[in-house]
């Protein structure tokens, strides 16, 4: 975490730590991302975090996360992804329903590629989160340009 924080500081980027809440508190990082079950068992995080993202997969989870104090949601995984080949994607309609059900920003994650991103065009998401595609592409600027096209 310290290394990631240094890199973010050098490049003037925001760092949001994930899953290790005690580390975020110890390092005085008030931005954290976790699963709903983690938040349910670590509700004291709310006292330390100014930004609290929660991963959700259903409308019910989204509503509960918002009630528990989430400041944004990560709806996943929207499309099929190599990271979770045996788990069915939640789909675009579920992401739309999540956006309608909550007042906080929702980001789409999972299987978002240049081929799938257009399916999110009319969904009221705040943005998308990229993982595998970005980490495995040989040309990051080109990949990002293709996503924005």
PLM region spans:
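Alpha-helix-loop-beta-strand connector modules within alpha/beta enzyme cores
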Residues: 1-17, 36-39, 43-58, 86-114, ...
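Acidic (Asp/Glu)-rich catalytic clusters
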Residues: 5-10, 44, 66-69, 121-124
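Conserved beta-strand positions in the central sheet of alpha/beta enzyme cores
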Residues: 16-17, 33, 53, 72-74, ...
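Alpha/beta enzyme core
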Residues: 22, 27, 37, 59-76, ...
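Active-site regions of enzymes building and remodeling cell-envelope glycoconjugates
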Residues: 29-33, 46-52, 70-71, 125
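Glycine-rich phosphate-binding active-site loops on the catalytic face of alpha/beta enzymes
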Residues: 36-44, 74-86, 114-148
